[in-house]
Amino acid sequence: MELLTQLLQALWAQDFETLANPSMIGMLYFVLFVILFLENGLLPAAFLPGDSLLVLVGVLIAKGAMGYPQTILLLTVAASLGCWVSYIQGRWLGNTRTVQNWLSHLPAHYHQRAHHLFHKHGLSALLIGRFIAFVRTLLPTIAGLSGLNNARFQFFNWMSGLLWVLILTTLGYMLGKTPVFLKYEDQLMSCLMLLPVVLLVFGLAGSLVVLWKKKYGNRG
């Protein structure tokens, strides 16, 4: 817990030298792995801010706090394994009360968007859906519910995971190298670190509102 606190303090202070410390960077990789795994894999964790975190990671790479190839590899594994768990939820646990309950608590428009993408584009929808919050968690579950072959799913799963991580991280890296960013580095870094927190709060609040409506809406 102390190491996690030090990590957050180093991030907020933009202390890239401390972040590059082996024990600190190990904790950072662990936290990022868990967040991306959960966001891609478990429906109740779909509100986690994966997109903005990847952009922040790209900036940290630009500042020398993290290595580019190992970060891309590790986070691709996290996203793809999480997506596989989501697929398994649909394939083997889709009819269980727990998974059906999770599905019912996601906003209806995300269900509609995910179903539309999957039925219109098939497996290639995974490539598109990776870049849409909530949908990237829901699509693999729908693929599993449809009885889709695991081997075909895995090909698109790992390809889309790599593209998602690579594109957003590279965007963050390029942002961190721009003259505008270098000029306003302190302010922009603070915004980039606050953005995932703000999105997390809004996502969690939205999920709680949906849960509340499901529980009490029918009583009115």
UniProtKB/Swiss-Prot annotation:
Cytoplasmic side: 49-52, 95-154, 213-220
Record's subcellular location: Cell inner membrane
One GO BP annotation of this record: response to xenobiotic stimulus
Keywords for this protein: Cell inner membrane, Cell membrane, Membrane, Transmembrane, Transmembrane helix
GO cellular component, one term: plasma membrane
UniProt membrane topology term: Multi-pass membrane protein
Up-regulation conditions: Regulated by the CpxA/CpxR two-component system.
Periplasmic side: 1-27, 176-191
Residue pairs linked by disulfide bridges in the UniProt entry: none
GO molecular function per UniProt: transmembrane transporter activity
InterPro entries (alphabetical): DedA-like, VTT_dom
TM helices/strands, residue ranges: 28-48, 53-73, 74-94, 155-175, 192-212
A Pfam family it matches: VTT_dom
KO phenotype (gene knockout): Double mutants lacking both yghB and yqjA show incomplete cell division, temperature sensitivity and altered phospholipid levels. They are also hypersensitive to several compounds known to be exported by other drug efflux proteins, including ethidium bromide, methyl viologen, acriflavine and beta-lactam antibiotics. Expression of either yghB or yqjA can restore the wild-type phenotype, suggesting that these proteins have redundant functions. Both individual null mutant strains grow normally at all temperatures.
Domain of life: Bacteria
Principal location class: membrane
Reported function: May be a membrane transporter required for proton motive force (PMF)-dependent drug efflux. Required, with YghB, for the proper export of certain periplasmic amidases and, possibly, other Tat substrates. May play a role in determining membrane lipid composition.
Family: Belongs to the DedA family.
Name under which the protein is recorded: Inner membrane protein YqjA
Native organism: Escherichia coli (strain K12)
Gene of this entry: yqjA
